[in-house]
Amino acid sequence: MIVEFFRYGAGLSKGPLDYFLGKKRDREHAKILSGNEQEVAGLIDSSPFAKKYTSGCLSFYESDLSDEAKRKIMADFEHCLFPGMSSDQYRVLWIEHRDKINEETGERRLELNFLIPNTEILTGNRLQPFYHEADM
């Protein structure tokens, strides 16, 4: 698994949502696995913070992970990003992509993309998910 955090995060939700889902929400081989698109967009668009969201991707060599395995990976990743927090304190929109081809196998590569509003839900305070470039 490769983890990549994207450098963007200052704009409105339209940018990352258009990328993840397509401008008309019709990106081929893209589907929402978890989270609420409208809620995440509302949190990002109403954010008073300079960096309104964090986004990135988990990319896999394997193309045949079960839905249960994907759910576990997403939950474990959230647990690492939000240590000590409960799931009612943050929101994550998870979008699966399968539009890139693995050149070695010829199969579609699995990517689990995430979009996180940088707002703590219960307090409205700024929330910056942990990742090494910002926190170490």
Which residue stretches match the model-derived regions?
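N-terminal nicking endonuclease/strand-transfer module with a His-rich metal-binding environment
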Residues: 1-136
